[in-house]
Amino acid sequence: MSKVSRESAPDVTDYGPAEDRGGQLDGYAVIFTSIREDWDLTPVLKGLPGDSCPCPHWGYVTAGRLTVRYGDHEEVIEPGEAFYMPPGHVPAAVAGTELVMFSPQDELAAMEAAMRELMMQQGNGN
């Protein structure tokens, strides 16, 4: 596939508070994320290295607000802003946030599998 849109995305993952629609482009995942309710990923990242996301992400926020915490600071990303999240971040978003994100496919798949397992252990899996 050489292109992907929210509507054409072949993969849909429902996390409860959020829905990801995505596809792959030459080793990178392209994910369109819709946040349905305020969601802080702190609990679902506990147990991963550093209790944070080990996968880098590049992206663009189209609506809402995304707050990204690091060990020594936090950043707020708002509509119209592009971002880079290096490994070691903990994101939180308000309801109504929409973004598109690009991540190395293999790293993202490993992180998502670990996150889903942690959510199931915590009784939050869908």
Question: Over which residues does each language-model region extend?
Answer:
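Short acidic-glycine-tyrosine-enriched beta hairpin
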Residues: 70-89
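Short strand-coil-strand connectors
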Residues: 26, 69-73, 94-96
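A short, N-terminal "cap"/entry segment at the start of jelly-roll beta-barrel domains
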Residues: 1-42, 49, 116, 121-126
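A short, polar/proline- and glycine-enriched secondary-structure boundary/capping micro-motif
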Residues: 42-44, 78-80, 110-113
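Residue-level detector of beta-strand face positions
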Residues: 22, 65-67, 92
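Short, surface-exposed beta-edge/turn micro-motifs
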Residues: 28, 55-56, 88, 97
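Short, conserved beta-strand element in jelly-roll/cupin
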Residues: 51-68
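Ligand-binding loop in jelly-roll beta-barrel domains
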Residues: 87-112
